[in-house]
Amino acid sequence: MKLTVTLPTHSYDLTIETGALDKIGTWVRSLWQPQRVAIITDETVNKLYGAAVEKELQAAGFETSLIAVAAGEQSKSLETAQLLYDFLAEQQLTRSDGLIALGGGVVGDLAGFVASTYMRGIHFLQVPTTLLAQVDSSIGGKTAVNTKKAKNLVGTFAQPDGVLIDPNTLKTLEPRRVREGIAEIVKSAAIADVELWHRLSSLENEQDLVAHAEEIITACCKIKRDVVEEDELDLGLRLILNFGHTIGHALENTAGYGVIAHGEGVSLGMIQITQVAEQQGLSPLGTTQELVTMLEKFHLPVTTDRWSEERLYQAITHDKKTRGGQIKIIVLEKIGQAKIVSLPTEEIRAFLNREGGI
């Protein structure tokens, strides 16, 4: 399956194909003429796919270099970015060369950020190997690193030249990482595709979803593609993709990056904000329970004891969606349809402190 992301200044294809990683050299050659390619990956993915990917690229005539960062959210930092800048400079990569992000969401965000800022921008490709990255973070051009203050606080918009998605990589993914991706899939269905929601309802568990991965990934990529085409720079409609993310990011930040996985934070965030939305009359009664039922089926968390009102308030008010004393909150009008509401930041405390918090 091939989907095209069509934007005013740059368009590119999403290639979704089981076994596609085995033909990565041919794919890259169809997109690029540069002879030198740097691969950024993490230590876990490198052990699984690094050598094979380099071999395929070299067979296609590319000169390759590879660097593997530590696996995990802690690598998504300015300090790691500096190490990567130094590596690219040592390899004498220029703006006529290219970079490949091979890995999950952390690698994709980090490598995309580095590619967009090294020498004021070099060409790059996304090759996501986790379910979360395949259905969400590899598409749309958002790149970022974290700081101590907030997740994704420093970043750019930079579109790749292409995205290669091979569902076979899910076979080597540990169950917790599969569930992370499922949280983003549930989010996508909840905000924009009731038919996908019904399809997810028909699946028995995580294993059943992975067995239908190409179908599910394609559906999510279509949602992301359509939203990004309408709002590339996150000024309006694209904000709906952040459903559950404001509180989710805050939970990740306050717990310490890596303690609560991104998908787990999103799961908790969707429940929390929907409980609030029901109380405010913004979402129909029973919507929270529909989410709980779906998320629990896939063994995603819906409650947590990691709830510090003050630290969460500080993290939320540093969120990128806070502008002019207002924060944009995404709520469900119904399953399959989201809307954006503005909330004064001073009201966040009342939300966090309400009776029955998560």
UniProtKB/Swiss-Prot annotation:
Cofactor binding, per record: Binds 1 divalent metal cation per subunit. Can use either Co(2+) or Zn(2+).
InterPro entries: Dehydroquinate_synthase, DHQ_synth_AroB, DHQ_synth_fam, DHQS/DOIS_N, DHQS_C
Top enzyme class: lyase
Keyword tags: Amino-acid biosynthesis, Aromatic amino acid biosynthesis, Cobalt, Cytoplasm, Lyase, Metal-binding, NAD, Nucleotide-binding, Zinc
GO molecular function: 3-dehydroquinate synthase activity; metal ion binding; nucleotide binding
Cellular localization per UniProt: Cytoplasm
Reaction catalysed by this enzyme: 7-phospho-2-dehydro-3-deoxy-D-arabino-heptonate = 3-dehydroquinate + phosphate
Residues annotated to bind NAD(+): 105-109, 129-130, 142, 151, 169-172
Major subcellular site: cytoplasm
Biological processes annotated in GO: amino acid biosynthetic process; aromatic amino acid family biosynthetic process; chorismate biosynthetic process
Role played: Catalyzes the conversion of 3-deoxy-D-arabino-heptulosonate 7-phosphate (DAHP) to dehydroquinate (DHQ).
Identification of the protein by name: 3-dehydroquinate synthase
